[in-house]
């Protein structure tokens, strides 16, 4: 579902008040925050439930959410067992 226009975009308070002059690394757990132009060319470390993953902000990522770039589940690949079936 799309967020109502009258509510505006959601940016976490911890990201709004972040001062990159004193602390250049931005670390957050707010995956639902929208990426705004203030964060262009910066790297934000987002928590995926296990570790912090770096997300580099570009012009293409503006208006999207931080959680779209951080996977929370491990991608499993099926491996061949190495045994061939006999006919």
From Swiss-Prot:
GO terms for cellular component: mitochondrial small ribosomal subunit. It is found in: Mitochondrion. InterPro entries: Ribosomal_uS19 (IPR002222), Ribosomal_uS19_CS (IPR020934), Ribosomal_uS19_SF (IPR023575). The keyword Zinc-finger does not apply. Its main location: mitochondrion. The keyword Mitochondrion applies. Pfam families: Ribosomal_S19. GO terms for molecular function: RNA binding; structural constituent of ribosome. Keywords: Mitochondrion, Ribonucleoprotein, Ribosomal protein. One of its GO terms (biological process) is ribosomal small subunit assembly. Belongs to the universal ribosomal protein uS19 family. This is Small ribosomal subunit protein uS19m. It comes from Dictyostelium discoideum. The lineage of its organism: Eukaryota, Amoebozoa, Evosea, Eumycetozoa, Dictyostelia.
